C-alpha cells in the first residue's frame, strides 16, 4: 500500500519546526503569521506562549472594508492593525515567525506593513 505525501506540506512543516525552535530558544516575543486561501491571521505571542495581541481578516472592521479577505491588500491591513495593537501594549521588538510559509506575497506584504507602522524585526 502506497501512502501519498504532499511535498509542499512536508517542506512547510520542516521549515516551521526549524524556525520555531530557533525563535523559542531565544525566548523572544514573536509575531506569528498564518494564512489560508481566504484569511490572514497574526498574533503576538510571549515567550510563555501567551497571546498578547491578535488581528485577522475575520474581524468585522476589516471584513467590512474589504471585498475579498485573502489577498495582499487584506494582509497589509492586518499588518497595520497588529503593529498598532502591539505598540499600544508597549511591544516594539519582535521575532517574525512565518509558520513555514515562504517569505513572498501576502506574508511579505504583512511583514512590510507591520514594519512601516513601527514594529522592529
UniProtKB/Swiss-Prot annotation:
GO terms for biological process: translation. Pfam families: Ribosomal_L18p (PF00861). It comes from the Bacteria. One of its GO terms (molecular function) is structural constituent of ribosome. Keywords: Ribonucleoprotein, Ribosomal protein, RNA-binding, rRNA-binding. GO terms for cellular component: cytosolic large ribosomal subunit. InterPro entries: Ribosomal_uL18_bac-type, Ribosomal_uL18_bac/euk. This is one of the proteins that bind and probably mediate the attachment of the 5S RNA into the large ribosomal subunit, where it forms part of the central protuberance. Part of the 50S ribosomal subunit; part of the 5S rRNA/L5/L18/L25 subcomplex. Contacts the 5S and 23S rRNAs. Belongs to the universal ribosomal protein uL18 family. This is Large ribosomal subunit protein uL18. The lineage of its organism: Bacteria, Pseudomonadati, Pseudomonadota, Gammaproteobacteria, Enterobacterales. The gene is rplR.
